[in-house]
Swiss-Prot record:
Domain notes: The C-terminal 15-30 residues (cargo loading-peptide, CLP, or targeting peptide) are sufficient to target this protein to the nanocompartment in vivo, while the C-terminal 5 residues suffice in vitro.
Keywords on record: Encapsulin nanocompartment, Iron, Iron storage, Metal-binding
Protein name according to UniProt: Ferritin-like protein
Subunit structure: Probably forms a decamer which binds to the pentameric axis of the interior of the protein shell; as the Flp cargo protein is flexible, packing into the shell is not rigid. 3, 4 or 5 cargo decamers bind inside the encapulin nanocompartment.
Keyword flag Iron: yes
GO MF terms held by the record: ferroxidase activity; metal ion binding
Species annotation: Thermotoga maritima (strain ATCC 43589 / DSM 3109 / JCM 10099 / NBRC 100826 / MSB8)
Record-stated family: Belongs to the ferritin-like superfamily.
A GO cellular component annotation in the UniProt record: encapsulin nanocompartment
Length: 114
């Protein structure tokens, strides 16, 4: 457990440790998506493929839940996600356009526009 911290645990608040837990879990979920996806695209058995697709998609849901928790709780995530998600703008040009900020999307992340 100590290897997940780069600073003394005693100097971290409970909330900071929750951030570490969520971030580590997010990394694990993303890794699981990658593993399942590789299995999906290489299996020859259709039934196995469908099961693995289901498992991969479940991991995506878990990752999305963790991102939402981070957005609501850890400073910086809300602004970053509002800036870069749910837009058709070229990803590499968004930061230049916003100068590090983001426009007000009315609290829906622009989803209603989809």
């Amino acid at each position: 457990m100590a290897d997940q911290y780069h600073e003394p645990v005693s100097e971290l608040t409970g909330k900071d440790r929750d951030f570490v837990r969520a971030l580590n879990s997010l990394k694990e979920e993303i890794e699981a998506v990658a593993w399942y996806h590789q299995r999906v695209v290489t299996t020859k058995d259709e039934t196995v493929r469908k099961i693995l697709e289901h498992n991969r998609d479940e991991e995506m849901e878990h990752a999305a839940m963790l991102l939402e928790w981070l957005r609501r709780n850890m400073p910086g995530w809300d602004e970053a996600l509002r800036t870069y998600l749910f837009t058709d703008k070229p990803i590499t040009e968004i930061e230049e356009e916003t100068s590090g900020g983001s426009e007000n999307t009315g609290g829906d992340l622009g989803i209603r526009k989809l």
